[in-house]
């Protein structure tokens, strides 16, 4: 279980304190109350209602068809089940195209029970992050492989190799300067993600970004070894195989994140 007092709900300031104290953060996606309740009870610190639901729940080939209404529905379902974990919800594709649109979508998500919203990218998104934070809405940034940009990237590919790594470091500092309280790094080479994590004052959560991040996240279907209908990424590990039950898998995943045994080199990307 988490070293954060089991009866004490996670808060945004507590995340930063965990980083200062060197305590790894455990995050999983969830899309309904049943799984969310199990994850919350067995050591998960943060729950992400991700727009990944478009692929693993709705059966689409990308996250692009997901709407704000979809996100609000699933966020509300998950929120009803949580006692401890901090709830993060994605802004869906183009919901953050302008600060005003982002505020409308974020307001709906917070009213549904989210405690933080996640925004992909930097660039013009810095204005959106600042706009939301100035209006008391906590923001998690998402850099590296940002699935909403899959068309521009030409597929799901590792980001931040070579000179792109320095740009990623600059973007990471920029989103924190804009007010982000948390940063997800996806499909980033381990050395770059480790350096970014050392650079920043806020926690980093890795997914395919190596063990040097301040925490880890997986899509729940991947953590449980379920067939999502898509190619299995390198960074995925089936914890149900060793855990024996959903609760056991969650405990095994949480322990592996906290003791640093996951991810190992087999589940990460070199420079």
UniProtKB/Swiss-Prot annotation:
Cofactor(s), by name: Mg(2+)
GO biological process, one term: pantothenate biosynthetic process
Residues involved in Mg(2+) binding: 51, 90, 120
Top-level EC class: transferase
Cellular localisation: Cytoplasm
Catalysed reactions, semicolon-separated: 3-methyl-2-oxobutanoate + (6R)-5,10-methylene-5,6,7,8-tetrahydrofolate + H2O = 2-dehydropantoate + (6S)-5,6,7,8-tetrahydrofolate
Catalytic residues (UniProt): 186
Cofactor notes: Binds 1 Mg(2+) ion per subunit.
GO cellular component, one term: cytoplasm
Binding positions (3-methyl-2-oxobutanoate): 51-52, 90, 118
Pathway per the UniProt entry: Cofactor biosynthesis; (R)-pantothenate biosynthesis; (R)-pantoate from 3-methyl-2-oxobutanoate: step 1/2
GO molecular function term, any single one: 3-methyl-2-oxobutanoate hydroxymethyltransferase activity
Keywords, sorted A to Z: Cytoplasm, Magnesium, Metal-binding, Pantothenate biosynthesis, Transferase
UniProt-listed Enzyme Commission number(s): 2.1.2.11
NCBIfam families per record: panB, PRK00311.1
Database matches in HAMAP family: PanB
Family according to the record: Belongs to the PanB family.
Subunit structure, as described in the record: Homodecamer; pentamer of dimers.
Protein purpose: Catalyzes the reversible reaction in which hydroxymethyl group from 5,10-methylenetetrahydrofolate is transferred onto alpha-ketoisovalerate to form ketopantoate.
Protein name: 3-methyl-2-oxobutanoate hydroxymethyltransferase
Source organism of the structure: Xanthomonas euvesicatoria pv. vesicatoria (strain 85-10) (Xanthomonas campestris pv. vesicatoria)
Protein encoded by which gene: panB
């Amino acid at each position: 279980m988490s070293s954060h007092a089991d009866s004490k709900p996670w808060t945004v300031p507590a995340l930063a304190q965990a980083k200062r104290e060197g305590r790894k953060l455990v995050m999983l996606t969830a899309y309904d109350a049943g799984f969310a309740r199990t994850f919350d009870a067995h050591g998960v610190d943060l729950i992400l209602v991700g727009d990944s639901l478009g692929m693993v729940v709705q059966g689409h080939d990308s996250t692009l068809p997901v709407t704000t209404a979809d996100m609000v529905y699933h966020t509300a379902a998950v929120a009803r089940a949580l006692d401890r974990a901090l709830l993060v919800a994605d802004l869906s594709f183009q919901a953050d195209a302008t600060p005003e649109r982002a505020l409308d979508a974020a307001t709906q998500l917070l009213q549904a029970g989210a405690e933080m919203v996640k925004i992909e990218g930097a660039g013009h998104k810095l204005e959106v992050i600042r706009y939301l934070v100035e209006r008391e809405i906590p923001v998690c940034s998402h850099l590296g492989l940002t699935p909403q940009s899959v068309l521009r990237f030409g597929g799901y590919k590792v980001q931040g190799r070579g000179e792109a790594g320095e740009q990623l470091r600059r973007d990471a500092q920029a989103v924190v300067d804009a007010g982000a309280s948390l940063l997800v790094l996806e499909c980033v080479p381990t050395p770059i993600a480790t350096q970014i994590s050392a650079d920043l004052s806020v926690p980093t959560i890795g997914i395919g970004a190596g063990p040097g991040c301040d925490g880890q996240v997986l899509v729940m279907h991947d953590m449980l070894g379920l067939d999502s209908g898509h190619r299995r990424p390198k960074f995925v590990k089936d914890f149900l195989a060793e855990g024996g039950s959903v609760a056991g898998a969650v405990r095994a995943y949480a322990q592996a994140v906290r003791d640093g045994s996951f991810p190992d080199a087999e589940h990460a990307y070199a420079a």
